[in-house]
């Protein structure tokens, strides 16, 4: 029941699934150089995040949630995460898509009746941002970006009692958008095939929302593309109807980049 309550709290403020933003990488041992031809990349990735958060109303705490990566994984029904990027010269455009479907069913005896609660949370997050290369050299690339992040979340909880033959359903929907700006890039480690990808952004949007994300890690180039492992953090705060919601997601993300 404790995990169910934690998941119900997550339903109030977006939960789960996260947005990891893998860095653009090259098949060579140095940062990709600028060209006047269109270049594309597709990066599927996975993020094993833990979730901590709190919710308060008029400065009075209404509850907290703390889910380990194992908790999130055990409740995960379906997930899809990818980045698609296009680049021509110094100009670029990327799309980061995340979909998560979490569900949990618990039961508890209330008197002589057995009460079951089934919670399902679906969340889609999209980031679309044009970017411009500020610095480009054989070993270092720095891109500036300005774009938007959108999030759609639907939570449904169904209470049922087989003994009493009664069912009740509650659902909520949340849609929020934010303008984000930030930097991303990579350092190549000498003449080796290893590099350091990095990313940071911050933005504001609807319902007095604030969001930020940052990651730092290590990657390696191969003939077919790149593999990266990063430590990733995403933070959200928004204030609908005098209610303050804080959500922090942190964990390791692994990504594979394919270029064409």
Regions found by a protein language model. Give the residues of each.
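Short glycine/proline- and aromatic-enriched beta-strand/turn motifs that initiate or cap beta-hairpins
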Residues: 21-96
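Short loop/turn motifs that connect adjacent beta-strands in outer-membrane beta-barrel proteins
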Residues: 28-38, 135-142, 189-194, 223-224
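Residues that define the transmembrane beta-barrel architecture of outer-membrane proteins
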Residues: 36-38, 76-80, 122-126, 140, ...
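Transmembrane beta-barrel strands of outer-membrane/channel proteins
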Residues: 42-48, 86, 95-99, 144-150, ...
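Residues on the lipid-exposed face of transmembrane beta-strands in outer-membrane beta-barrel proteins
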Residues: 42-44, 82-88, 128-132, 146-148, ...
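Extracellular/periplasm-exposed beta-strand and loop segments of Gram-negative cell-envelope proteins
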Residues: 51-77, 97-125, 151-176, 205, ...
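Solvent-exposed loop/turn segments connecting transmembrane beta-strands
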Residues: 74, 138, 201-213
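Predominantly the C-terminal beta-signal and adjacent terminal strand-loop region
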Residues: 209-210, 214-260
């Amino acid at each position: 029941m404790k995990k169910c309550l934690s998941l119900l709290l997550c339903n109030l403020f977006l939960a789960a699934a996260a947005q990891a933003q893998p860095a653009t990488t090259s098949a060579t041992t140095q940062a990709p150089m600028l060209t006047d031809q269109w270049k594309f990349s597709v990066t599927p990735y996975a993020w094993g995040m833990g979730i901590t958060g709190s919710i308060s109303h008029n400065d009075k705490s209404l509850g907290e949630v703390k889910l380990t990566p194992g908790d999130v994984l055990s409740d995960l029904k379906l997930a899809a995460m990818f980045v698609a990027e296009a680049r021509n010269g110094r100009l670029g455009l990327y799309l980061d898509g995340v979909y998560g479907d979490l569900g949990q069913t618990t039961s508890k005896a209330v008197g002589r009746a057995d009460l079951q609660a089934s919670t399902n949370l679906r969340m889609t997050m999209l980031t679309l941002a044009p970017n411009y290369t500020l610095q480009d050299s054989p070993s270092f690339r720095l891109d500036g970006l300005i774009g938007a992040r959108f999030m759609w979340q639907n939570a449904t909880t169904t209470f049922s009692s087989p003994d009493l033959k009664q069912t009740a359903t509650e659902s909520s929907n949340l849609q929020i958008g934010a303008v984000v700006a930030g930097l991303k890039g990579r350092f190549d480690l000498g003449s080796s095939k290893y590099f350091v990808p990095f990313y940071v952004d911050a933005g504001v949007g609807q319902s007095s929302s604030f969001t930020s994300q940052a990651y730092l890690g290590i990657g390696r180039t191969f003939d077919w593309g790149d593999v990266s492992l990063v430590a990733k953090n995403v933070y959200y705060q928004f204030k609908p109807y005098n209610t303050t919601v804080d959500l922090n997601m942190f964990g390791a993300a692994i990504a594979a980049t394919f270029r064409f």
